Amino acid sequence: VNWMISLYQNGLNGILADQMGLGKTVQTIGFLSHLRSKGVLGPYLVIGPLSTLSNWVSEFQRWTPSIPVLLYHGTRQERAEKRIEFLPTSTPIKPDFPVIVTSYEVVMADRKFLAKYNFKYLVVDEGHRLKNFDCKLIRELKYIPTANKLLLTGTPLQNNLPELWSLLHFLLPDV
């Protein structure tokens, strides 16, 4: 968590890569909780595979029950209802604004709505999904304003220059 805090304080993005099951989710939740405790209310966007979303929500509720979290998924109509009820586009962000947890597919479908926010942090679970620079997900994520990015992966990074370049270019587009 201290490493993620250091990244934030230095205005850097990062990749948290270790073996599966070593606590990347809980560490990230602890980090976002730290930011909120310092007055950085967000908004925060966590995206990942559909199969991990309920775990993210339950871990937020378990470790940081005071932080509102929204599982932003469902049919187009269900998402529209959630936008109206939970996701005001007014500024500034208030303490009750939830951490948005959603899937890659919903980000691509609702990119125009999500682009209305200036996210303080974008967390991409299973970040190795971005190893192909030409993938649609990377193209859509570029349109969502984000101050900081963190990729999480339990899959070893391959010694493959195009894949590494894609991940690093997503994190550091100006370098």
What are these regions (language model features)?
Residues V1-V175:
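ASCE P-loop NTPase motor core, strongest for the SF2 helicase catalytic module
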